[in-house]
């Protein structure tokens, strides 16, 4: 029987001796490698946090003591130690184990927001609540060095240090977020890793001077009074202690005994303490340790023996199309610069950074700063392109509104992972941008449907000098090209069904990458003898006025978007038609106003009613409600209507 099979709660970890802990750590690493290889997930961060997590659960009493995992992707070991090892076969699968902490899964999981730099603020609030309620409970916040580049962490540290509350901040310092951590903080932490143990020197001096009558104690006090000056020379940890935080470390994060000892000192101190643990991402798994890009930060299904992907798809991703095009644009325009927030490789800027290293700026996990810095770059005569996951632009809305749009700065935002992302769950879905950006004056939004329109609309956005622009696209592979068969104004027509006598017609407005879905919907609807036209507005803010006349020419308007219905493109089109006195009914299909659980993208799309068969059924029902019974149907009940006019192959062949 393996030692791991005997672990079902943190109490089981507390009874182990040091030799057993080393065995358990090795078994956990082997378990993680094989489990994540089958499902995909965040492998590297968790391999680097094994001993650290073991030590935390030995020193503190979860769930009475609260353990908060910033970002949360490094919580797999925590899940194992709290009785969820048997559930890893369903990791990140529909109805299975979440890839992040989940309050629905366990009482040991406190926060589940996977946006970085938030845990310290939660810790501040929790510790204040326990103090006011008279509860003697410790709060432990585990935060990576990458997350410490986020300003919210420093706002929290400033407040945590104001009172003597038992908050233990564990800095898991692996020198990376997705990529190597950058900036002044990274340099400071690097200095700490290399510095000698100042506290040991101070203890020896205190012991020697303490044995010296009369002169010794006053001399020690004098030396202790200039402690800050000594520390700044010997060990540059003053940045933390100047805030009023006790600092312990640096500690070898892969020595469970050393980490446990440091955590016990921190717990017994009774006030706010930072425990600085130096770890290695991907530790103990050679393929991860040798991966220079991101140490297997996130992997798909891999061969655990080699770390190589089990299958290599030849299909091109949206991100790679963007990556290729922005490099080409950069070669043509030396004024184009790019920014990202600790996501250089994930958002496709690796090639741009290699080609133009002086024109790419990774600002760390600091989206607010990235946006306003981009405004400054634009004011200075450059053309900044800010590249983020769509969900992370939520964090910088005020900067988009006031620092960019108010000043009419031509900043382009490229939002990767827009819409439903799937396996990463609620906080990674990019399903809000089309709604909250609708209220920003002067901002234009493009939603490309395929590779050619992504390339074209990116160029249009970068070439716009009138104000800010946004280009959004989803996670995953690009479907085959969907060429237009016609254009009306600036609107692309993708499909027209044959005119069928006495059948009312539908205008189906497809938003972005929903084009392939909408074409399948159109063919299903047309097979029922209903006339239908599919159009793609390309730019969804502001909407092209050509949509007004198109709507007038149809009896029902339907919008389909991979975004929330509330405040989305459907709502904007409804307002446009009302303002133009167009009295045509409109049905807007999108995502309901709720958070979505993890699962494959197609599974989640089906759950929210955006699968082609469900949309087609709803369109047919909407048409039926608005027309009388048909007397002379030219299509017999068992006979499908003729295929519609559209470019390319049948939709079944495209998928």
From Swiss-Prot:
Keywords of the record: Isoprene biosynthesis, Magnesium, Metal-binding, Thiamine biosynthesis, Thiamine pyrophosphate, Transferase
Region (Disordered): 626-655
Cofactors named for this entry: Mg(2+); thiamine diphosphate
Molecular function via GO: 1-deoxy-D-xylulose-5-phosphate synthase activity; magnesium ion binding; thiamine pyrophosphate binding
EC number: 2.2.1.7
Binding residues annotated for Mg(2+), in chain numbering: 145, 174
Any Pfam family hit: Transketolase_C
Catalytic activity: D-glyceraldehyde 3-phosphate + pyruvate + H(+) = 1-deoxy-D-xylulose 5-phosphate + CO2
Biased composition (Basic and acidic residues): 646-655
GO terms for biological process, alphabetical: 1-deoxy-D-xylulose 5-phosphate biosynthetic process; isopentenyl diphosphate biosynthetic process, methylerythritol 4-phosphate pathway; terpenoid biosynthetic process; thiamine biosynthetic process
Keyword check for Cytoplasm: no
InterPro entries linked to this entry: Dxylulose-5-P_synthase, THDP-binding, Transketo_C/PFOR_II, Transketolase-like_Pyr-bd, Transketolase_BS, Transketolase_C, Transketolase_CS
Record HAMAP family: DXP_synth
Function: Catalyzes the acyloin condensation reaction between C atoms 2 and 3 of pyruvate and glyceraldehyde 3-phosphate to yield 1-deoxy-D-xylulose-5-phosphate (DXP).
Subunit structure as annotated in this protein's UniProt entry: Homodimer.
Protein name as annotated: 1-deoxy-D-xylulose-5-phosphate synthase
